[in-house]
Amino acid sequence: ELYKEDTQKAERAALTLIDGLHENFRKRAGQADVLKQLIADSPYPTLVCGDFNSLPSSYVYHTIKGDKKGDKKGNKKGNKKGNKLQDGFQTSGHGYMYTFKFFKHLLRIDYVLHSPELKSTDYFSPDWSYSDHNPVVMRMKL
């Protein structure tokens, strides 16, 4: 009886965790769709930086960057100039980089994305003891 009760508690806890993660993924996807539209409507060079809490393979990352054709509703509207944003790490970073300190230093979930007109010259993420994320620094040529 005790084993059955413990198993049921563990199952409920796991389902609650999964529901919470799903809700967070859904919220971030909606925010990415809104940001994509703002970027698409802007006639100016764009710089987007922040804690996306999403991997480089995620819907959020690719939507904000402009890699995905359309949002989750199927709307297809790209940047007015037809440009995708570039990932500063890919344009001027070196080697392997993580920004989330836990999970064995495997996750890069903080980004600086920029229009091709903006030129990055250096990109790094120094160790930082004040947060569970390391900051991201990108130098640019103006």
Place the predicted regions along the sequence by residue.
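Metal-dependent phosphoester-hydrolase catalytic domains
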Residues: R26-L47, F52-L142
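Catalytic-adjacent loop/helix segments of enzymes that bind and process anionic phosphate/sulfate esters
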Residues: E1-L38
